[in-house]
C-alpha cells in the first residue's frame, strides 16, 4: 500500500487535495528497470522532502534548470538532457516503471545533468522548488480527461498556473503540449487568464514545436495519420 497524493480541482481551479492509500496498479518493474533503480537512484534520484532544493549543490554547478512534469518512460527527457549539456534537468514522474526506464536510458546515454523525482509534482513544486528558480517548466501530453465531467481532474487549472509561475524566473517559460485539441483550448483559456504571463505565440494561440522538444515516435505516427499536436508557450513577465 502506498500513500499517493491525487489532485482534483473545483470550478475556480482550486486544489481539492485528497490523499488516498491504495495499491498502485502500475505493473512490475522489468529486470532492467529494477537494476537501474538500484544502481542509478543514488546518483540521479531525488528523495522528496518538504525542504527547498539547493540546485547548485545537487548538480555541482550553477546553470539554468528545466523541470518536466510527468516524463513517462523518460526517452524524450533524456534526449533533451543529452542535447543540452549546458542545462540542468529535473524530471518528476509517479509511475515507478517509468522512473526506472528513465534512469536506465539516462545511464546508457551517459548524461550527468539529469535528476528525477518519484513523487507528486504539485508537492514538489510547492515545497521543494525554490521560488523563481527555474528557466523552463515542461508539461507534455498530460492526461486530457476528455469526458466533460472529468475536466476538473485536468492538471492545467488557474491555481496550477500560479504554482508554475511562482517556480519560474522572470523570463522563464511554461511549455505545454497536447494532442487533444479540446485540451489545447482549455490550456489557452487558463493561461490567457493567468496573471503574470505572456503568450509567446505571435498569433496569440499556439507555437510551432520548438527544436528543444523531441518528436516522439507516437507523435510522428500521429502526424502521418493526420493527427494534430498543439504546443503552447507562456513566458513569466511579472
Swiss-Prot record:
GO terms, molecular function: tRNA (guanine(46)-N7)-methyltransferase activity
PANTHER family with a match to the protein in the record: 3-DEOXY-D-MANNO-OCTULOSONIC-ACID TRANSFERASE/TRNA GUANINE-N 7 - -METHYLTRANSFERASE, PENTACOTRIPEPTIDE-REPEAT REGION OF PRORP DOMAIN-CONTAINING PROTEIN
Active site: 143
Protein origin, superkingdom: Bacteria
Family: Belongs to the class I-like SAM-binding methyltransferase superfamily. TrmB family.
InterPro entries per UniProt: SAM-dependent_MTases_sf (IPR029063), tRNA_(Gua-N-7)_MeTrfase_Trmb (IPR003358), tRNA_methyltr_TrmB_bact (IPR055361)
Binding site for substrate: 147, 179, 216-219
Residues where S-adenosyl-L-methionine binds: 68, 93, 120, 143
Biological function: Catalyzes the formation of N(7)-methylguanine at position 46 (m7G46) in tRNA.
Catalyzed reaction equations: guanosine(46) in tRNA + S-adenosyl-L-methionine = N(7)-methylguanosine(46) in tRNA + S-adenosyl-L-homocysteine
UniProt entry tagged with the keyword Phosphoprotein: no
GO cellular component: tRNA methyltransferase complex
Pathway: tRNA modification; N(7)-methylguanine-tRNA biosynthesis
One Pfam family cited in the UniProt record for this chain: Methyltransf_4
Protein name (Swiss-Prot/TrEMBL): tRNA (guanine-N(7)-)-methyltransferase
Keywords noted in UniProt: Methyltransferase, S-adenosyl-L-methionine, Transferase, tRNA processing
EC number, UniProt record: 2.1.1.33
Broad enzyme group: transferase
